[in-house]
Amino acid sequence: MKLYDTFSAAKRVFDPIDSACVKIYACGPTVYDLAHIGNARSAVVYDVLFRLLRELYPEVIYVRNITDVDDKIINAAAETGQNIGDFTERYIRYFHEDMDALNCLSPTVEPRATAEIDTMLQLISRLVESGHAYVKGGSVYFSISSHRHYGRLSGRKIDEMISGNRVSIDAEKLHPGDFVLWKPATEQDIKLGAAWESPWGGGRPGWHIECSAMSYRYLGESFDIHGGGADLMFPHHENELAQNMCAFSGSEYARYWVHNGFLTVNAGEKMSKSLGNVITVRGLRNSGIEGAVIRYVFLCTHYRKPLDWNEKAIFDAQSALSKMRRSCEEFTSEELNSDIEAVGVHNMLLEALKDDMNTPMAIAALHALVGEINKTTDFKERLKLARVLNRSAKLMGITDGFAGKSAEEAVDVDKIQELLERRREARNGGNYSLADEIRDQLHSMGIVIKDDKDGVTRWSRA
């Protein structure tokens, strides 16, 4: 398996720290609003990676955090008059419902920032004691100048940090690029339940220390893969990396850094509230677009490439999914899904996913399977191929198992083959009356037959 590693700017063979247990961390939602399709794309990307790793390794621990305290949450909660716990609970529930609709597996662990304050305080204390952080006016700042490797992940130099995203100029800072680890609580913070005691006074954590603490708590000082959107590379991931490398001498933090590309709408337009073009998963679902279609649109573009969301992409996804489902509809659910985990995944699909999660190539393999199913005349061979399609689509999360027909609609394949053989013999012997009777008998059983030009008779359920 190969993954593109942002840190080394190259596709690398995946070599986990411990092949018996692969560990992955992905940045999750900040729960102050409904999940939009940019959030959803990232979730689907790392869900596919989680599924693939589970296919290849005996154990996988996937941690995806929930940021349930930050400036946006506090401001939004203040507008409603709720404390941050009550306010975020609703959006966490909505997020989980959306993820279920997209068929994203639950992560192994889903920590909330507000439940991990003690670990954050522990890390901040280590950074202060080691000289990588300093206290000014009740705030604690990380000193980027203290970390000689700062900027290597995003390819930036310390002198350029002042122009970086989310970097504010503050007279308290020793360097404009220094970032806050702990900030003093305001009256509003206290009122909304967004303040905790610390050695530096009442306050709340900075954004970056939250992920450092949660990854450390559940995955240790070093782990295999850190994932997130390309927009998080700087400053968030750069700062996470600096914090953990400085808190734990000798730690590499994450062995591989994986970033999914940006998402635009309607021919390259950036989503923003000011433009009024933010598309939420819930909004799409309420308009009748099923989660499988949303997921399929994401998978049609390689995760590292920009993705443009538009009506044509939705239509194409709906059409493609319909073709897959139709290729399996003659079989019962039991035929398609019984002991499905024992069915091998399509080799071309698996190899595509192992090559830096090449989902477009994997989808092409699925449609090649659909073509084989549709041109195969033998029922048992079609069923065999359909089960491979079902298993392979399940690996990608496109389905949890194609539905097929109910058990009551099952047919006796051996009986059908016997009747088809009798009909062939009747036709060859010129007994067309008997051949027609057998055709009618098959029709009464719900079986439609078609005689091809080459003399092969195909059958399917009506």
From Swiss-Prot:
Family matches, as HAMAP family: Cys_tRNA_synth (MF_00041)
The name this protein goes by in its record = Cysteine--tRNA ligase
Q: Where in the cell is it found?
A: Cytoplasm
Q: Which organism is it from?
A: Anaplasma phagocytophilum (strain HZ)
- Fetch the SMART domains from UniProt: DALR_2
Its domain of life reads: Bacteria
Name any one GO molecular function.
ATP binding
Q: Which family does it belong to?
A: Belongs to the class-I aminoacyl-tRNA synthetase family.
Q: Which UniProt keywords apply?
A: Aminoacyl-tRNA synthetase, ATP-binding, Cytoplasm, Ligase, Metal-binding, Nucleotide-binding, Protein biosynthesis, Zinc
Motif 'KMSKS' region, chain ranges: 270-274
